Curated annotation (Swiss-Prot):
Catalyzes the decarboxylation of oxaloacetate into pyruvate. Seems to play a role in maintaining cellular concentrations of bicarbonate and pyruvate. It catalyses: oxaloacetate + H(+) = pyruvate + CO2. Homotetramer; dimer of dimers. Binds 1 Mg(2+) ion per subunit. Substrate binds at residues 47, 156, 232. It holds the Pfam family PEP_mutase. InterPro entries: ICL/PEPM, Oxaloacetate_deCOase_bac, Pyrv/PenolPyrv_kinase-like_dom, Pyrv_kinase-like_dom_sf. Its EC number is 4.1.1.112. The keyword Metal-binding applies. SUPFAM superfamilies: Phosphoenolpyruvate/pyruvate domain. GO terms for biological process: oxaloacetate metabolic process; propionate catabolic process, 2-methylcitrate cycle; pyruvate biosynthetic process. The keyword Plastid does not apply. The lineage of its organism: Bacteria, Pseudomonadati, Pseudomonadota, Alphaproteobacteria, Hyphomicrobiales. This is Oxaloacetate decarboxylase.
Amino acid sequence: MTWRSRREALRAILSGSRCARPASVFDPISMRIAEDLGFEVGMFGGSVASLAILGDPDIALITLTELAEQVRRMSRAAALPILVDADHGYGNALNVRRTVQELEGAGAAGLTIEDTALPQPFGEATPQLIAIEEGFGKIKAALDARGDPTLVIVGRTGALAITSLEDAIERAQAYEAAGVDALFFTAVKTRAQLEAIAAATTLPIVLGGPSEEISDWDYLAAQRVRIAVQGHAPIAAATQAVFDTLKAAAAGTPPMQLQGLASSELMDWVTRAALVKQRGANFLGLKK
């Protein structure tokens, strides 16, 4: 699957009538597992990227180069379309252009640009938002930088958790006017909030962590939600598994008695061992 076909697959989700559950992915193996299990799209969250690449919390320490290289590795490993959290675009509107170019070249099917002021400004104890005008400019810059018109650009606002529903809607309308392909909202908790957002906008909606009140997939689909992020449990599960295994090993548990390990069959599957062996036979004269 080419980069463009992945982007077209993401666009098909956004233009459809269902709400998709994305797989939270963070490396080549998680990409392959998600693809093999039948997920339609992967979400590479900013917090997950910070954990996977730096081992740091989500405080905007990661660089564009680090993010793009990880996306490139993931894109190479599987054909699953990836929606990448590009945070604030790593700077101003001109930096956003570079961000789009790098992530497009790395194989991202789509990316989100948000209006949170990152990194956190000096002296501010709580998250802040950039001005609507600056956010509008960032979206216009992102669209201008796009080499492949099928690359999905998503405008994201965190206003609902910081200012108000009215501000979130005003920002979303500005990003829609700028030409984004979809709108991403965080901190939507109630049906009333979601219905107000859906009524005030026309584009496909992506939700970050919908609350229990609105976690009905038919309802979400009816409100034009096409992707609903379900948190990032896989990297937490992987972290716990590594911790438990190393804890047992440190306590003296023999390797053959360690619990919860992937079988050799699963390891062969996720590493595409049979394909690598076939290539060895084809190109190195090795026996199958």
